[in-house]
Amino acid sequence: VRVSPTGEFASVEEIGDVLIGSDEKRLVYLKDIADIVRAYEEVPSKMYYVNGRPALTLGISMQSGENVVAVGERLSRRVRELADTVPVGMELTQIYNQPVEVNNSVNGFVVSVGQAVAIVIGVLLLFMGLRVGLIIGTLLIMHLNGIELQRISLGALVIALGMLVDNAIVVAEGILVRMQGGMRAAQAASETVGKTIWALLGGTVIGILAFSAIGLSPDSTGEFAGSLFYVILYSLLLSWVTAISTTPMLCALLLKPGQNSEGGQRGPYAGVVFTVFRGLLAFAIRQRILTVVVVVGLFVAAVVGFGSVKQAFFPESNTPLFFVDVWEIEGSDIRTTREDALRVSEFLRGLPGVEQTTTVIGGPHERFTLVYDPREISSAYAQIIVKTDTRERIPEVWDKVEDYLQTQMPWTDPIIKSLRIGPGRDSKIEARLHGPDPTVLRQLSEQAQAIMRADPEAKDIRDDWRQPVKLVRPVYNEQVGRQLGITREELAAALRFAVEGTPVGRYRDGIRVLPILVRAPDNERADVGNLQDINVWSPVLDQAVPVAQVISGFETVFENAVLRSRDRIRTIIASCNPTGELATPLFNRVKPQIEALELPPGYSLSWGGEYEDSQKAQSGLGRSLPVGFLLMILTSILLFGKLRQPLIIWLTVPLAIVGITAGLLAANGAFDFMSLLGALSLIGLLIKNAIVLIDEIDQQVAGGKEGFSAILDATVSRLRPVILAAATTILGLIPLLSDVFFVNMSITIMAGLGFATLLTLVFVPTLYSLIFRIRPG
């Protein structure tokens, strides 16, 4: 038989039956001298409300490698099965359902990709004929199979769209022209592939290397967008393989040889468009110095104009959610914070378009997205998740709640922020001040905040130490304390017993373990003035004495409730947000003023916020970007075995900024991280087209054709493929203009590619004639 002297209580009532000794050597029941109750914490540590009603939250995360949509469907099915077991009066409400959001986002994006593919196929059918269009369109759809459906990988597929069709266009164009000249299908396919295989491979490899900085970037931004590089790697290599294998085979099967009455090479390019372009190109080459001067002038203007382009880091999410963070004065009771947070929540629910509010008081929500930035636990903090019917409704609700907080609750310190897609912070501009003395750091922070307040475009101005809190401190009388045998620790324990309660045991209730607290009655704890009457045991007198006998009195002081350090150095952050969308203009104004502050010896300043995030992302790219560009340059040199041809190609690359600047300024877009990816795509397209064109010129010159004629004929032969590749890419990006995540990237590629096409067809041959000293005639 097992003996188990656990001493556990079977019920709360049993606690009251515990016998304790008294001064009269008698035993009394605990329930005779104390009230024993089971209750919740008097001051909660955290509270949840959904639409103003008390709630409990359950967060569920997915295991790695699982399909989030499939997991969501299984969870929804299980929740429906458990609906009948929910107690009466309770209901299950979804705050954020990531599987649904992912499914909607991917489905919407797939529709956009489908529209883009349809546009691409339509353009090819219009300009290259039914059979060739069906060939390339079929190959394009083949590339879509097997690609994992998520935002970054689908974006990578759209970025690669122009490159995917370009390889097939070049091969199909060459075969079509040769067969129209009367050449047999097999011979036309063999000759076309033989002449273009290495140029296309070189262009494809360089296009892939343009994105290697993303895949090799070691920072969090590289991790977030790393799949983009691998999708482009696989899709472009596959496009090259199919362009030199499947495309010739299908062309040979489906295309019919034609008869060219002129019998020469110029027969397929004798149309009006080709003739006019030949004349314009000949004029540009004859006036090549003027052409170069004009292009260089446009480049200088674009570099200057790029300074006026808005700068951003990551775009915002499409999900119709945003956050309202409500900060009370530091040290506020959580119940006061709850009252104000519920007041804001009630106001929000009365606004048109607001479907749901979810409020947490005392700390952050469970982390429900990768980029959610949870705040620390604080009784002065509350966060409200606001769900609207559409994303377009957010600015209207945002403005109204911001005005309400400023006018009706001016004592609060609110932060309103959107749900981001990529990395980011609460404050876009952060000035970090480092030093040893908290008082000096607060003074420096106030100076920095004063500079921010002086700018009308700044809002949400604060520091992360927040306000000093009021503290009641007993002044221990050491002489009296020694005489009575009462130490500082015993004094603190007596005060803690009276105010908070002292844990003396644990009560097990099924699976719950509840603390047993002993504390003074409520009437003794309700008034600060009663603290001096609290008894503390004196071993010298062998009796309890009032706290007033051990202290000289109480003093009210202010102290820093929050002190933060960075790299083991005291650090305070003065921060703000712009009233508009972009932080860069405001940052550029306040940065020199804050840096002009006189810092005492031992104090320093550094910058955080979007500036630091952007610098880290660019630094991560900066460590891997040179390697990628070096490999691109080496590939172009090895491809030609000479230096002048790669020199022509790389002299044209910086000129892509002309189209980028013009497009972003005209569309009032911002150059963000996705725009950077679009620019890399643009570089790959530009280099690839230039490689194929220069390779064609070299082949014609090597075949004995006079230099000027070789440049004209080769460039005219590339007119249709280059324009088709550009048109398919530009038109294919139109559906993405409505997606906030890809809009700036789309503008960058569309505008940049338009000018890059002009560069390829006019400036590259002009530069070729200049560097190789080929004169007209």
Which residues does each PLM region occupy?
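Extracytoplasmic/periplasmic membrane-proximal domains and adjacent transmembrane bundles
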Residues: 1-115, 125, 172, 442, ...
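Helix-loop junctions and hydrophobic alpha-helical segments within the transmembrane domains
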Residues: 95, 102, 106, 172, ...
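Transmembrane helices with small-residue packing motifs
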Residues: 144, 214-223, 259, 296-332, ...
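Hydrophobic transmembrane alpha-helices and their membrane-interface caps
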Residues: 91, 118, 122-176, 234, ...
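Solvent-exposed, membrane-proximal periplasmic/extracellular interface segments of envelope transport
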Residues: 2-10, 335-424, 479-501
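Flexible hinge/switch segments at interdomain interfaces of large molecular machines
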Residues: 6, 47-54, 94-96, 250-260, ...
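Transmembrane alpha-helices and their membrane-interface boundaries in multi-pass membrane transporters
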Residues: 160-175, 196-216, 223-264, 384, ...
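Signature of alpha-helical transmembrane segments and their immediate interfacial
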Residues: 194-196, 264-314, 355
